[in-house]
Every structure is written in structure tokens, then in C-alpha cells.
A protein has these predicted regions:
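Short, hydrophobic secondary-structure boundary micro-motifs
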Residues: 106-108, 121, 147-152
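Hydrophobic alpha-helical connector segments
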Residues: 60, 74-104, 154-161
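Amphipathic alpha-helical packing segments from all-alpha helical-bundle domains
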Residues: 67-71, 118-145, 155-163
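Short coil/turn segments at alpha/beta junctions that flank glycine-rich nucleotide-binding fingerprints
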Residues: 25-29, 80, 101, 145
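Amphipathic alpha-helical segments used for helix-helix packing
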Residues: 99-119, 170
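Helix-turn-helix
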Residues: 14, 18, 22-56, 60
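N-terminal intrinsically disordered/low-complexity leader segments
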Residues: 1-10, 17
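Short amphipathic alpha-helical elements of helix-turn-helix/winged-helix folds
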Residues: 18-22, 97, 134
Length: 170
């Protein structure tokens, strides 16, 4: 990794840490972009290179961890388990992760509704799609094993399951 790339990663990490600290200490509404930039020891323009607004900063804080948690969650279901048990295994990982950071998790859950634009949006939407695709595969496998009887497409069922899960988080 070049020195320039390393400096970018260090800057990104300082911004993530500063935003997480200030959101936790002062609250999402009270923390300002200017305070976050100052705490991260970067200029306001540099901060805006990484996140368009505070909402985007929330996803800068969470995307990397959420991606790793989703990897773990999708590896949890065991072949042969009932679909419900597999789904519980997937969602349990996410629930535990969110429970470990209640203040920041509340902010994330408030801000993720309709989040579709911003510098971090594509990454977040990709993670969410990967989770829905994983649920779809579990549903498809259950259909093929004749463990669930439905003519609905696995993709439709997976989206409904995901939306119920999302609603339960709020």
C-alpha cells in the first residue's frame, strides 16, 4: 500500500472515530460536521470528501462493520435446519451486534430508512442486497427440500422477510 493510500485510510478512520465519539457523547442532532472535522483533525472540505452530510457519516461509521457482520450472519445457518431456525441464526448475529452499541445503533436504525444517496449509499445498499440474496437462497433451499410449500418466488419471500426484520429493529 502506498503512503498516499495509507494516509487516506488513516484520515477515514479518524473521521469515523470522531463521528462515532461525538454522536455518542452529544447526540446525533447536536453534533455538527464542523465539530467532527475538528475532532478528526481534518478540514471541513476533507470531511465532505468522505461523507456528504451527517447521515452519510453514520454509514461511514457502520458500513465496514455491517459488511463483516453480514458475512458472519450468512455463514451461521446450517444445512438441514428448518428455515425458521436458519433465519433466526442469521438475524441473531445482527441483533447481538446492534445490542452491543445501543446509542449508535439507534442512530443507524433511524437513518437507514430510505437511505439511497450519498457517498456511502452504494456500499450500504450492496450489503443490504447481499443479506436479502442470502435470505432468498435459504428460502429457495427450503422450497427445493419441500420444507415450505409455496408457489411464490424466493426473491419475493426474501424481501418480505427482510422488511419484517427491518421493521422489528425499529
Amino acid at each position: 500500500m502506498s503512503l498516499r493510500e495509507r494516509k487516506k485510510l488513516e484520515t477515514r478512520e479518524r473521521i469515523r472515530a470522531a463521528a462515532a465519539e461525538l454522536f455518542t457523547r452529544h447526540g446525533y442532532g447536536a453534533a455538527t460536521m464542523r465539530q467532527i472535522a475538528r475532532r478528526a483533525h481534518v478540514g471541513l472540505g476533507t470531511l465532505f470528501n468522505y461523507a456528504e452530510d451527517k447521515r452519510d457519516l453514520v454509514f461511514l461509521i457502520f458500513n465496514e462493520e455491517l459488511n463483516a457482520v453480514t458475512d458472519v450472519a450468512l455463514a451461521e445457518p446450517r444445512p438441514g435446519q428448518a428455515l425458521l431456525e436458519q433465519l433466526m441464526a442469521v438475524f441473531r448475529v445482527h441483533y447481538r451486534w446492534l445490542a452491543g452499541k445501543p446509542v449508535l445503533a439507534r442512530i443507524l436504525l433511524q437513518e437507514l430508512t430510505f437511505y439511497s444517496s450519498g457517498k456511502q449509499a452504494a456500499t450500504f445498499l450492496g450489503i443490504r442486497k447481499r443479506l436479502i440474496d442470502g435470505i432468498e437462497q435459504l428460502v429457495r433451499n427450503a422450497q427445493e427440500r419441500r420444507k415450505i410449500a409455496t408457489r411464490e418466488k424466493p426473491a419475493l419471500i426474501a424481501r418480505h422477510i427482510f422488511f419484517v426484520y427491518s421493521a422489528s429493529l425499529r
